[in-house]
């Protein structure tokens, strides 16, 4: 485990958790952003993810998306599912989608930051992104129909379901 968290990470995550969210994701940052252009690119991607995806989602009270490992889960969700049920290549996306389909909104805490190490070579980055691409399609093929149906069946979940399909 190469992740590092800020000093107030747990305190900040608990604020969002205490506001009613059973799943809370945080600001993902690169531990080795200054190694080279590849790691710097990951940092820019994470800024985009935080500031232009999860932050606006939180502002309009739709579901955010878990990315990587920096998230909190209420034990009631694990108990309800009889353990961890997400096993696709992108289990973070699968976890987000299954929670949305179960009626849970994922919250976002931009003031809780965690850092993880990113690939440093083009080949490592390529292989990781190919895994992510395959994983995205696994999630789409497994849950796409349910997301589409729920999008129109449950009007309050339209934006969250649409967002995950896109």
Where are these regions (language model features)?
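Long helical/loop segments within the catalytic core of UDP-sugar-dependent glycosyltransferases
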Residues: 7-86, 130, 137, 141
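The conserved acidic donor/metal-binding loop of glycosyltransferases
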Residues: 1-4, 87
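Catalytic donor-sugar/metal-binding loop of nucleotide-sugar-dependent glycosyltransferases
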Residues: 61, 87, 96-115
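Residue-level signature of catalytic and energy-coupling elements of molecular machines
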Residues: 2, 24, 99
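Basic/Trp-rich segment in TM-proximal cytosolic loops or flexible interdomain/linker regions
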Residues: 60, 120-166
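Short, non-transmembrane cytosolic segments of multipass membrane proteins
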Residues: 2-3, 102, 109-134
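Short, hydrophobic alpha-helical packing/hinge segments within bilobed ligand-binding/sensory domains
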Residues: 95-96, 125
């Amino acid at each position: 485990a190469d992740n590092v968290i800020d000093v107030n990470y747990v305190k900040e995550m608990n604020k969002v958790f205490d506001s009613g969210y059973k799943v809370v994701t945080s600001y993902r940052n690169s531990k080795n952003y200054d190694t080279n252009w590849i790691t710097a690119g990951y940092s820019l991607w994470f800024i985009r993810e935080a500031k232009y995806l999860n932050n606006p989602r939180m502002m309009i009270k739709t579901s955010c998306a878990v990315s990587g490992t920096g998230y909190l889960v209420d034990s009631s969700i694990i108990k309800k599912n009889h353990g961890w049920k997400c096993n696709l290549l992108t289990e973070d996306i699968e976890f987000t989608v299954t929670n949305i389909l179960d009626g849970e909104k994922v919250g976002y805490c931009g003031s809780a930051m965690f850092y993880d190490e990113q690939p440093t070579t083009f080949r490592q980055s390529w292989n990781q992104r190919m895994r992510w691409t395959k994983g995205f399609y696994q999630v789409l093929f497994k849950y796409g129909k349910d997301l589409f149906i729920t999008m129109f069946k449950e009007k309050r979940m339209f934006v969250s379901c649409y967002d995950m399909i896109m």
